[in-house]
Structures are given as structure tokens and as C-alpha cells.
Amino acid sequence: ISKYKLFVSDTGLFVTMVFWDKDFAENIIYQKLLADKLEANLGYIYENLMAQMLTAAGNRLFYYTFEKDEKHSYEVDFLLSRGNKICPIEVKSSGYKSHTSLDAFRAKYSSRIKNSYLFYTKDFMVGDNEMIYIPFYMAGLI
């Protein structure tokens, strides 16, 4: 194993730990987070949330990267096993229309994929490309 990800089993505790700078967090960051007005990239929090929810639903989680070019690589946030097929998952805190890594993975391994999921903050839909877009709160249903 050359790369791995670690997740905290309690996302609420994780958020508190990430933003725990008493003078700043309690007064500004934490209030903005609670009001859903934080401008920061919250991808790592959403990924942790998904890891917690998918694991609670009984899924074994896998992570995958593959080379894009000499200096860059693609990253698939999660892979789920479904029989002899896999389900790649991308987690988006914003900008859900861009999913380059997931598209590259789907093109490379199309015969091995059952369903492709993108979790995001909007409503459920099935895209033109047969990608399934799912709101975060439905993670336990896949």
C-alpha cells in the first residue's frame, strides 16, 4: 500500500477538532459553519461524513488513485464492492459538474463498474452519463 486515507469515526468531533482555535473558531468559523456560510473548501469534512455513513451502513471502503501524467494522479474517493462489480464514489462539497477523476476511472474500467455515484448537496438525479447524483443524507441507502 503506497497511499491511504484515515477518517475519524465521529464527524461532529472531527469538525470540532479541525476548527478548534478558541479565539477564532468559536466566534467566526464555527458560527459560519453552523449557518452554512463558510467559504472554505469543506471536501475533507464531507469525505469524512461519507466514510462514517457508508461504514455505518455495513460497507467496506476502498480508495483508489491512478496516474494521470508524470506529476499528477486521479483519485477516486471511495470504491464499494458489489458482487464481481465495483461502484466508484466521488464526494463533492461544491462544483459537482466537474468530476474528472471519476470520469477517467469510468472510462478506464467501464466493464467492471456496476453504478457510479456522486454525493453532493443537491437533489437526487440520474445524469445523462448514467452517473447517479445523490444527496449526502441518502448515503446509507446505496
Where are these regions (language model features)?
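Residues at the starts of beta-strands that form the adenosine-phosphate
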Residues: 60, 114-115
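Arginine/glycine-rich "motif VI" loop of SF2 helicases in the C-terminal RecA-like domain
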Residues: 105-114
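Active-site ExK catalytic segment of metal-dependent nucleases
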Residues: 85-96
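Active-site-adjacent loop/helix micro-motif of nuclease/hydrolase catalytic cores
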Residues: 95-104
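Domain-level recognition of nuclease-like catalytic cores that cleave nucleotide substrates
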Residues: 121-142
